[in-house]
């Protein structure tokens, strides 16, 4: 089964804790602090592996975690950084943040590497907190947690040419005739429910990948008839071959069929309407096809479309269609969802204010990424560490901000898991 969507949890490694240590040496009674820093946590890195074709592996394993950094040691020895976790994905994989829907990476080129979750920084050892008035600091900072999130992986087919059209117009038959693919073929709608891929070999030096996109119907852009699942596979094809049942064997008008499919493409993503299209007027061996073809040409050809009369069942006209498609592909650029410059910077948080304060049910709530890191890094059972915390929030302007909001002695302040009464 072709798997094109997966949901996985990724967790970067936590940073190692800084060490609390003091120099010990014979004949030296009072050595200074020499606690080393914790190591950085490992990153979660996605890499494009051209040998992979599906997301099948992610159906069986859904949780991935990089290695934590090691704690610091004595004698100013830093902890070892955690190993990065490499997750291999097939070309064409789109990585999205499940919570925000934001595209984190569009992974196309083989070997492309993107850091999706960054490892936490290692905590500072007590050697960093020595001052003229605090020469033997008895506290250090713990490591910061690594980033964690649920991501959605979507595999958008890396086909050069996509066969589109209503169900049962002959797309699968065309694919089976011009490639070695063996799609399921039957005379009813939605025979194809997963995309089929095949390689079209023109000659020893020229070949391209063709995808049989499952049939679209009116309302596909709203998800009707599995429309969303089918439409997303069209987005990265360079060229579309629009297959039309020119015989009208199912009672539909070929011109109307053509209009409906293009309207669905436009409503789903207007960019798809600009994708070059070749028209394969299929089922020319059926009674009434010649008459319908002339009517179809009069309406569609003036718009600049190239029309190829074909009969997939008898393999007539397909060679001309395929050779023209191969020539057209040479003239077209590759298509991607986001450009490479976007890929170079991914999952970079928008710069936030260091803190914000609001009053909630009489409690002053202080939040912000800097505040969260500070609270996590302080040992409130250690007096020196507590003093460090008090000086830090004063230097950052939190105390002044609280007083400007009218805080009084004895009022409650909450900083994430920390809650305390305010006193000057």
Curated annotation (Swiss-Prot):
InterPro entries: G_OBG, GTP-bd, GTP-bd_Obg/CgtA, GTP-bd_prot_GTP1/OBG_C_sf, GTP1-OBG_CS, GTP1_OBG_dom, GTP1_OBG_dom_sf, OBG_GTPase. GO terms for biological process: ribosome biogenesis. GO terms for cellular component: cytoplasm. GO terms for molecular function: GTP binding; GTPase activity; magnesium ion binding. Residues 159-330 form the OBG-type G domain. Residues 1-158 form the Obg domain. Belongs to the TRAFAC class OBG-HflX-like GTPase superfamily. OBG GTPase family. This is GTPase Obg. The gene is obg.
């Amino acid at each position: 089964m072709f798997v094109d969507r997966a949901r996985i949890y990724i967790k970067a490694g936590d940073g190692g804790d800084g060490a609390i240590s003091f120099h010990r040496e014979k004949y030296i009674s009072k050595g200074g602090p020499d606690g080393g820093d914790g190591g950085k946590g490992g990153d979660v890195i996605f890499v494009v592996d051209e040998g992979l074709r599906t997301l099948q592996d992610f159906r069986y394993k859904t949780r991935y975690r990089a290695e934590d950094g090691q704690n610091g040691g004595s004698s100013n020895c830093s902890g070892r950084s955690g190993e990065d976790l490499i997750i291999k994905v097939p070309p064409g994989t789109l990585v999205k943040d499940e919570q925000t829907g934001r595209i984190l990476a569009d992974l196309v080129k083989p070997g492309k590497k993107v850091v999706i979750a960054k490892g936490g920084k290692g905590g500072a050892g007590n050697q960093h907190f020595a001052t003229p008035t605090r020469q033997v600091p008895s506290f250090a900072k713990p490591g910061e947690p690594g980033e964690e999130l649920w991501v959605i992986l979507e595999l958008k087919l890396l086909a050069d040419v996509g066969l589109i059209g209503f169900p049962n117009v002959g797309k699968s038959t065309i694919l089976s005739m011009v490639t070695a693919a063996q799609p399921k073929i039957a005379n009813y709608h939605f025979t194809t429910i997963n995309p089929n891929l095949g390689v079209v070999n023109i000659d020893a030096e020229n070949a391209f990948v063709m995808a049989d996109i499952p049939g679209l119907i009116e309302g596909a852009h709203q998800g009707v008839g599995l429309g969303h699942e089918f439409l997303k596979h069209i987005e990265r094809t360079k060229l579309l071959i629009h297959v039309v049942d020119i015989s009208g064997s199912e009672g539909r008008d070929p011109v109307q069929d053509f209009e409906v499919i293009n309207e669905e493409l436009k409503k789903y993503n207007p960019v798809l309407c600009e994708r070059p299209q070749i028209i394969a007027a299929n089922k020319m061996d059926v009674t009434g096809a010649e008459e319908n073809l002339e009517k179809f040409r009069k309406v569609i050809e003036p718009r600049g479309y190239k029309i190829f009369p074909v009969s997939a069942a008898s393999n007539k006209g397909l060679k001309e269609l395929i050779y023209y498609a191969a020539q057209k592909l040479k003239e077209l650029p590759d298509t991607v969802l986001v450009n490479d410059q976007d890929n170079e910077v991914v999952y970079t948080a928008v710069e936030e204010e260091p803190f914000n304060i609001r009053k909630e049910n009489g409690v002053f709530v202080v939040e912000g990424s800097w505040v969260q890191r500070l609270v996590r890094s302080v040992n409130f059972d250690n007096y020196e560490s507590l003093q460090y915390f008090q000086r830090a929030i004063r230097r950052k302007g939190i105390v002044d901000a609280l007083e400007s909001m009218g805080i009084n002695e004895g009022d409650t302040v909450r900083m994430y898991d920390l809650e305390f009464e305010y006193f000057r």
